[in-house]
Amino acid sequence: MLNKKQQAMYKDQRVGIFIDVQNLYYSAKNLYKAKVNFNEILKIAVGNRKLIRAFAYVIKTDELKEKTFFEALENIGFEIKSKDLQVFYGGMKKGDWDVGIATDAIELAPKLDVVVLVSGDGDFTPLVEHLQRVEGCKVEVIAFGKSSSSKLIEHVDNFYDLDINPRRFLI
């Protein structure tokens, strides 16, 4: 992990991974016109530590390709949590997993030493503070620094900036 507050990783640390797939997908698409290599993300998130659970939070649309994508995520070790894209009157669309990710992280925290959030969304800052202060967990974030909240980065124990070596994490 690369951060001003570099923390050591220990092989006995229990790790839970929570990936905001939409956040990472759109960051890679907008910054690099590429797709994310989720297998590489999983490898750096776990490191040499003990993986307890890894969740990928996805939004279902009507695209045929997404079923194959979701199966690929499962095949590399992610548990898929999905919800339908909400379409509101007037055409506005919303697919938001922030509360679901926060709830799952808080529920699993007593069984973890480290929570890894894969998202640069600043809305997770209160979650980070809660996990550190109340649950006693270290919190790491993996995201593209160019599209990440500086406030979120400031609060985490470790930040891995995918922009430092983007080719490793893109396909």
Residue ranges and their predicted role:
Residues 62-171:
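Nuclease catalytic cores that cleave nucleic-acid phosphodiester bonds
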Residues 2-97, 137-138:
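Domain-level signal for Mg2+-assisted phosphodiester chemistry and nucleotide/NA-binding surfaces
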